[in-house]
Regions:
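Interhelical loop/hinge segments that connect adjacent transmembrane helices in multipass membrane
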Residues: 1-3, 7, 191-232, 271, ...
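N-terminal membrane topogenesis motif
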Residues: 1-25, 78-81, 85, 208-224, ...
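Signature of the first transmembrane helix
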Residues: 6-67, 95, 99-103, 159-163, ...
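Hydrophobic transmembrane helix module of multi-pass membrane transport proteins
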Residues: 20, 52, 89-227, 233, ...
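Membrane-interface helix-loop junctions in multi-pass transport and translocation proteins
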Residues: 33-41, 145-149, 159-191, 360, ...
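Specific pore-lining/lateral-gate transmembrane helices of multi-pass inner-membrane transport
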Residues: 71-89, 250-366
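Membrane-interface junctions at transmembrane-helix termini in multi-pass inner-membrane proteins
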Residues: 130-154, 337-368, 410
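Membrane-proximal transmembrane or re-entrant/amphipathic helices at the cytosolic face
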Residues: 433-481
């Protein structure tokens, strides 16, 4: 299999896994919103937000470090075994520490966010941490080895198990059952990863050196991820602080749909991180430039198409799935989409600085946007509520995008074809203006469908080169046959 075929295959498997996992996780949000209401959905989202935030710090970036060093030393069995051993043993210790921390601090979190119910939920969630930390490290091993088929299937199984466990428990135990479902799914996923992926015999040879190497690299990515997490989660946390759990539930629906369009760039990034690391180690700079250009452009087409869909049909989709209680999610969604589409263009290659060894830039670049995000949320949420939170997040994402592109051009000599992106955005903007002008004169669903077909056709004809279309057709023919 050629490098191109391998790349397309990996992206395909990862995209399908992400799509299926998202679809499997979607009913949980719908049931919580419809059956239990915005209050309990808000509690569940707060639990998930705290879970993701704490997980970011307790792993100390071990999964990202494992991806990088496994990709670089995949042909050196001895070094590979030492890296895996160092990562696994360290992850087990970190998992136990995180369990104790969350269990003891549960009441404190509940007091900070003025949600007494959080205490019991977090004590349940604490049992997931030892398994979740180890799971993250083992997924990093699969990514580093580019075992994307295994990665995809296990991700799907994890999401399916969470859905099944949640549905079995939620109707009798409410939101408590949903949190227990999280715990059970991570326990099962950890056991499955250990069974499926052959792990080298654990060795303490050079353990301290390898653990230090992993933590040294990983800790630098933690700050970056923490800053990005502020950009992703500060709005929900601050709505939880300034407003109510009901507002958290309503706003979380807008966030969920806004992040839905990141499914493709997120899938691509899982491949580009180890691939760019490998190219950099082999000094294949030309391949890096081509890869970045293609990934960003095709991510852009997908993101813009998805954004257009939600502008046309988002209000109907929210009302149909979640009911009238969540109709106020639509306007924050539109505001958020502006930031998510622009930031998503670079998201597919978001790990490029870590891949080429510019680790310090990984956290320095988003720092400005994180500061602006916090300040803007503090200022805007008390005045404009959910819309203020969405605006603060969008501005911070745009700032992060501008700074990242600037450094990519300056330090890695990545050339961005700005004219191409302007044409895509201008074309879609015209279609959106046409829709808004005539939606009250023509059936809005029919009009939206026609305009999306036109948009898709124009993208295919004018923004995908014949060379790339021929390659795609050739690869598709190979897989079909």
């Amino acid at each position: 299999m050629s490098d191109l075929q391998k790349f397309v295959s990996d992206v395909g498997f990862t995209f399908i896994a992400s799509a299926v996992s998202m679809l499997l996780g979607f009913p949980i949000t719908v049931v919580l919103g419809r059956y239990l209401g915005a209050d309990d959905l808000g509690l569940y989202r707060m639990v998930n937000t705290i879970f993701g935030t704490v997980m970011l710090f307790v792993t100390i970036g071990i999964p990202a470090a494992v991806i990088k060093y496994v990709a670089e030393f995949r042909d050196n069995d001895k070094k590979l075994g030492q890296i895996v051993s160092g990562g696994l043993i360290t992850s087990i210790l970190l998992g136990l520490i995180s369990f104790i921390f969350i269990y003891v601090s549960a009441s404190l979190f509940a007091a900070v966010f003025h949600m007494p119910e959080l205490s019991g939920l977090l004590k349940i969630l604490a049992f997931a941490f030892p398994f979740s930390v180890v799971t993250g490290m083992l997924f990093g091993l699969l990514n580093g080895l580019r075992e994307m088929t295994k990665n995809a299937w296990i991700s799907i199984i994890q999401s399916a198990s969470m859905l099944i466990f949640t549905f079995l428990l939620i109707f009798n135990y409410g939101v408590n059952g949903a949190v227990v479902g999280i715990v059970f799914s991570y326990v099962m996923t950890t056991l499955l990863l250990i069974f499926v992926q052959k792990i080298p015999n654990l060795t303490f040879s050079n353990f301290s050196d390898n653990a230090f190497q992993l933590i040294n690299f990983g800790s630098k990515t933690v700050l970056s991820n923490a800053i990005n997490l502020i950009n992703y989660q500060a709005d929900i946390l601050m709505i939880g602080y300034f407003m109510t759990k009901t507002d958290v539930g309503v706003y979380s629906v807008a966030v969920m749909f806004a992040k839905l369009i990141w499914i493709l760039p997120d899938s691509i990034q899982k491949i580009t991180f180890p691939l760019i690391s490998e190219y950099h180690a082999k000094e294949m700079n030309g391949s890096i430039h081509i890869l970045v250009d293609k990934c960003m452009k095709y991510s852009c087409l997908f993101l813009v198409f998805g954004t257009t869909f939600f502008i046309f049909f988002g209000n109907r989709v929210i009302s149909l799935i979640f009911g009238a209680e969540f109709e106020h999610s639509y306007f924050p969604l539109i505001i958020l989409l502006i930031g998510t589409v622009l930031y998503g263009i670079t998201k597919s290659v978001g790990s490029i600085f870590a891949s080429v060894g510019k680790v310090s830039l990984v956290y320095k670049i988003p720092l400005i946007s994180a500061i602006s995000n916090i300040v803007l949320n503090i200022v805007l949420i008390p005045i404009y509520g959910m819309n203020g939170a969405a605006l603060a997040t969008t501005i911070s994402l745009i700032v992060s995008t501008v700074v990242m592109i600037s450094f990519m051009k300056t330090l890695i000599n990545i050339r961005v074809d700005f004219i191409w992106y302007i044409k895509v955005l201008f074309l879609s903007g015209l279609l959106i203006c046409f829709f808004l002008s005539f939606k009250n004169l023509i059936n809005d669903i029919l009009l939206g469908v026609i305009l999306q077909i036109i948009e898709l056709t124009l993208f295919s004809v004018y923004f995908i080169s014949n060379h790339d279309k021929n390659k795609m057709f050739h690869l598709f023919s190979i897989y079909v046959n």
